[in-house]
Amino acid sequence: MSDKKYNVDEGEIAKFSRIADKWWDKSGEFKTLHDINPLRLDYIDGHADLCGKRVLDVGCGGGILAESMARRGAAFVKGIDMAEQSLETARLHAALNNVADIEYECIRVEDLAEAEPHSFDVVTCMEMMEHVPDPAAIVRACAKLVKPDGMVFFSTINKNPKSYLHLIVAAEYLLKFVPKGTHDWKKFIVPAELARMCRQAGLDVADTKGMTYHVLSQTYALCDSTDVNYMFACRPAF
């Protein structure tokens, strides 16, 4: 097994560990994730049909997406994260809400890919890659974990002045949607770069969607613009 510290930002782990008990507070630090989760879930289910599938959620945090995929009909959902405190929150919430066929493990995705290659119908890695030193390694591991006829989903944040204004200046400092320091603009990823990572990992990008926030209605919606938040739906190229 490789060095457990590789591709792990200890500062990011500590940051999310400090607020691990807030994951299921829909008006707290993770409100935005709760708000966009129905969009993410429908996008994934629309492309991959979760019913009866084995699913892996990489960087699952407190289990917001993982639990919703289990409720949508997945046969088995595994969530992995490097913040054990977040996983404890996820396990407790699933147990209290009688969500079956779901498990959580503190393990790097690269190590899981070595242990269980080509073992999941669906692999999701949402709002996670902008928090690690080497996102390309994450993409390669996800590609190794998915079955040849499966699908991999990524979501992250574009790197441009608009995303800086929306996600850092507005979301962190003006509107206070998320705590200050949640995002590091230097780690944002332009879609062309993520597409290159996917190709080099043996994945074809089948679809791309963006997400936009409507200020007046205070709701999120899918859109064709990838200027800020965006998602990829990918298939193995071989």
Curated annotation (Swiss-Prot):
Coiled coil: none annotated. InterPro entries: SAM-dependent_MTases_sf, UbiG_MeTrfase. Pathway: Cofactor biosynthesis; ubiquinone biosynthesis. It is an enzyme of class 2 (transferase). Keywords: Methyltransferase, S-adenosyl-L-methionine, Transferase, Ubiquinone biosynthesis. GO terms for molecular function: 2-polyprenyl-6-hydroxyphenol methylase activity; 3-demethylubiquinol 3-O-methyltransferase activity; polyprenyldihydroxybenzoate methyltransferase activity. Pfam families: Methyltransf_23 (PF13489). It comes from the Bacteria. GO terms for biological process: methylation. Its EC number is 2.1.1.222, 2.1.1.64. It catalyses: a 3-demethylubiquinol + S-adenosyl-L-methionine = a ubiquinol + S-adenosyl-L-homocysteine + H(+); a 3-(all-trans-polyprenyl)benzene-1,2-diol + S-adenosyl-L-methionine = a 2-methoxy-6-(all-trans-polyprenyl)phenol + S-adenosyl-L-homocysteine + H(+). S-adenosyl-L-methionine binds at residues 40, 59, 81, 126. Belongs to the methyltransferase superfamily. UbiG/COQ3 family. O-methyltransferase that catalyzes the 2 O-methylation steps in the ubiquinone biosynthetic pathway. PANTHER family: METHYLTRANSFERASE (PTHR43464), UBIQUINONE BIOSYNTHESIS O-METHYLTRANSFERASE, MITOCHONDRIAL (PTHR43464:SF19). NCBIfam families: UbiG. This is Ubiquinone biosynthesis O-methyltransferase. It comes from Neisseria meningitidis serogroup A / serotype 4A (strain DSM 15465 / Z2491). The lineage of its organism: Bacteria, Pseudomonadati, Pseudomonadota, Betaproteobacteria, Neisseriales.
